[in-house]
Design a protein with these regions (language model features):
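A short beta-strand-loop structural module common to alpha/beta enzyme folds
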Residues: 56-62
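Short, charged/polar surface micro-motifs in flexible loops or helix N-caps
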Residues: 38-40
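Short beta-strand segments
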Residues: 31, 34-36, 43-44, 60, 90-92
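Divalent-metal-activated hydrolytic enzyme cores
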Residues: 1-31, 64-71, 80-82, 97-139
């Protein structure tokens, strides 16, 4: 079974059984969190912080970095449109972005069929936002 079919099946079951409560779009703890998209944090970070559904705006990206405008846009929306008053930047150890190699990324992109001329339009070194030290990345 394709993973999409499995996901759709699980979603249907969830929706059929869901008895949800109405929640505000505004974070109840007035908190925004920028963190890493690492799949090991799923279902782990929020309980570790005592954050429940509706408590915080969780913004995830590769390496919990502010590279480009997307993270800033999400943080600004959380603060100025949705009432967040505090922002946490939370990293973790053994982050896959630490020491990331733009040349390896370029090669992987080419292997997947992305034309070199498209890759050359982006400064991969700054775009990938690699860092060497997880702790320094959040300080």
């Amino acid at each position: 079974m394709m993973i999409l079919n499995e996901i759709l099946e699980n979603n249907k079951k969830f929706v059929d059984e869901f008895e949800g409560e109405e929640l505000s779009h505004h974070p109840q703890k007035k908190l925004a969190i920028l963190t890493c998209m690492d799949c090991r944090l799923t279902g782990f970070l929020e309980p570790a912080l005592g954050i429940g559904r509706g408590d915080a705006k969780i913004i995830k990206n590769a390496g919990n970095t502010i590279v480009g405008e997307d993270a800033i846009r999400s943080i600004a929306a959380a603060i100025f449109s949705l009432g967040a008053e505090e922002v946490l930047v939370i990293g973790h150890t053994e982050c896959g972005m630490a020491g990331s190699d733009p040349d390896k990324l370029r090669n992987a992109m080419i292997e997947r069929g992305i034309p070199q001329e498209e890759i050359d339009k982006v400064d991969l070194k700054s775009w990938i936002g690699g860092f060497e030290d997880e702790e320094e990345n959040v300080i």
